[in-house]
From Swiss-Prot:
Name this protein carries in UniProt: Cell division protein ZipA
Membrane topology of this protein: Single-pass type I membrane protein
Gene Ontology biological process terms from the UniProt entry: division septum assembly; FtsZ-dependent cytokinesis
Residues exposed to the Periplasmic side: 1-6
Subunit description: Interacts with FtsZ via their C-terminal domains.
Role: Essential cell division protein that stabilizes the FtsZ protofilaments by cross-linking them and that serves as a cytoplasmic membrane anchor for the Z ring. Also required for the recruitment to the septal ring of downstream cell division proteins.
GO cellular component term of the entry, any: cell division site
Disordered: annotated span: 39-61, 66-85, 124-159
Family per record: Belongs to the ZipA family.
Record-annotated membrane-spanning stretches: 7-27
Entry keywords, A to Z: Cell cycle, Cell division, Cell inner membrane, Cell membrane, Membrane, Transmembrane, Transmembrane helix
Compositionally biased intervals (Basic and acidic residues): 75-85, 139-159
Length: 303
């Protein structure tokens, strides 16, 4: 009985000793693994503290040597990357790349300049897509303006040439020196010469003596304003009348001038007056030829 009890105690003691040994080994390994796992963190903390100390020393030195550059040093230190922060930024690179907006986290400020620069480059390229269109549009507008200006200049030159081509030939029927023409006899002679009273209150010679068709030449009073009143011409007197025509005119200008000359000579004969040229001098054959030459010259320019 005593031997059995002793054997049991020996076995229980051996088991207890083995359990204690195993527990000691397990505890030792656990502490060792925990020690190795904590060492990098402590080392990183120590390095970061040293970095902060170095930065503080550098800042103090720079403040002593360059007091006016304090803001530049501080700005440079804010963007200075720490070892632990750089590793954290590397882990968050994928997250930042997937995020469309810029992060406000101070730890990610190192990445913001790159993102901002990329966006700025894209934004600068986008407006340039329409730059050439705008330049082409401006070029088209300038070309259109130049063409329009040239067209206006050509039209102006053409109009000026047209105005230069048109001339006025004038003949005067005047009374002798110190006399005046009688209105009643003058009116009868004017009507017999084929004139009709019309626009501007003067007489006009139309293609048809009845008063229809285009006007070939006209007759006005030499006294301003040059108009007539047929109802009061019985008691009317005037120093003379003026007959004028435009060149070119309807039909043949040379033939129209002959008709005007014949009408002036007939009226002068009826009222006892004389025919004068545009300078109010006696009309001579040489002056008549000069009128015809002016007509030919004007028509030649037109052609």
């Amino acid at each position: 009985m005593m031997q059995d009890l002793r054997l049991i105690l020996i076995i229980v003691g051996a088991i207890a000793i083995i359990a204690l040994l195993l527990h000691g080994l397990w505890t030792s390994r656990k502490e060792r693994s925990s020690l190795f796992r904590d060492r990098p963190v402590k080392r990183h903390k120590h390095d970061r503290q040293n970095s902060f100390v170095d930065d503080s020393d550098d800042e103090a030195f720079d403040n002593q040597q360059k007091p006016y550059a304090h803001k530049q040093v501080k700005s440079h230190q804010e963007y200075k990357a720490e070892p632990a922060i750089e590793r954290r930024q590397q882990k968050l690179t994928e997250i930042d790349a997937a995020t469309p907006e810029e992060s406000d986290d101070p730890l990610l400020t190192g990445r913001q300049p790159e993102t901002t620069a990329r966006r700025a480059a894209i934004e600068e390229q986008e407006p340039q897509l329409g730059l050439f269109e705008f330049e082409e549009q401006n070029e088209s507008e300038r070309n259109g303006s130049a063409i329009e200006e040239k067209s206006q200049e050509a039209a102006g030159e053409k109009e000026a040439q047209t105005k230069v081509k048109e001339i006025v030939l004038v003949l005067h029927v005047a009374a002798h020196h110190g006399q005046e023409l009688n209105g009643e006899s003058l009116l009868q002679s004017i009507l017999q010469s084929g004139f009709q009273f019309g626009e501007m209150q003067i007489f006009h010679r139309h293609v048809n003596p009845s008063g229809s068709g285009p006007v070939l030449f006209s007759l006005a009073n030499m006294v301003k304003p040059g108009s007539f009143n047929p109802e009061t011409m019985v008691d009317f007197t005037t120093p003379g009348v003026s007959i004028f025509m435009m060149v070119p005119s309807y039909g043949e200008s040379s033939q129209n001038f002959k008709l005007m000359l014949q009408a002036a000579q007939r009226i002068a004969s009826d009222v006892g007056g004389v025919v004068l040229d545009d300078e109010r001098k006696m009309l001579t054959p040489q002056k008549i030829e000069l009128y015809k030459a002016r007509i030919r010259s004007t028509l030649g320019v037109q052609v």
